[in-house]
């Protein structure tokens, strides 16, 4: 009986300690980050093991690279319900997101470019458009 109680206490302790770790993310510079849910976000605030952010590129971000000025991203549409956004957004935002999500669903394998200095997000792009834009912007990441 005491062994069982010890196991329960250890399990509870492990759960408690790991729940306080916060959100895992990789800093991409200028407050941009890749977070564990496979999104690229712009961090607005970080305090008390909580992360507040604006979503920039939705899941599934499978690959990314960055330098001092740009972040380049490879995203795959996974067919999830994540892209069925709710009707809670205002009309301008909802229409904009629907148009972007429709394009993501159509392309499926999307590329993005984020200019960290101007906060400009270019995408979703097909591979050939992405390569052309990288040449135009002299991106060599």
Tell where the protein language model's regions lie, with residue ranges.
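Sec-dependent bacterial lipoprotein signal peptides
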Residues: 1-20
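Compositionally biased, intrinsically disordered low-complexity segments
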Residues: 8-13, 64, 86-88, 107, ...
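N-terminal export/targeting and maturation segments
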Residues: 18-70, 74-76, 82-88
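Structural motif
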Residues: 79-92, 107-112
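Short, surface-exposed, polar/charged, turn-prone segments marking secondary-structure boundaries
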Residues: 92-93, 141
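Short consensus segments that form the blades of beta-propeller domains
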Residues: 99-104
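C-terminal partner/receptor-binding element of secreted or periplasmic proteins
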Residues: 105-141
């Amino acid at each position: 009986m005491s062994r069982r109680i010890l196991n329960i206490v250890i399990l509870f302790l492990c759960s408690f300690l790991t729940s306080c770790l916060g959100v895992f993310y990789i800093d991409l510079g200028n407050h941009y980050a890749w977070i564990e849910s496979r999104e690229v976000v712009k961090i607005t605030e970080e305090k008390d093991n909580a992360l507040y952010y604006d979503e920039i590129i939705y899941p599934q971000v499978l690959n990314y690279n960055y330098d001092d000025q740009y972040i380049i991203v490879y995203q795959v549409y996974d067919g999830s319900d994540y892209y069925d956004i709710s009707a809670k957004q205002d009309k301008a935002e909802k229409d904009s997101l629907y148009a972007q999500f429709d394009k993501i669903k159509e392309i499926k394998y999307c590329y993005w470019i984020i200019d960290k200095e101007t906060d400009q997000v270019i995408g979703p792009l097909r591979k050939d458009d992405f390569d052309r834009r990288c040449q135009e912007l002299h991106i060599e990441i």
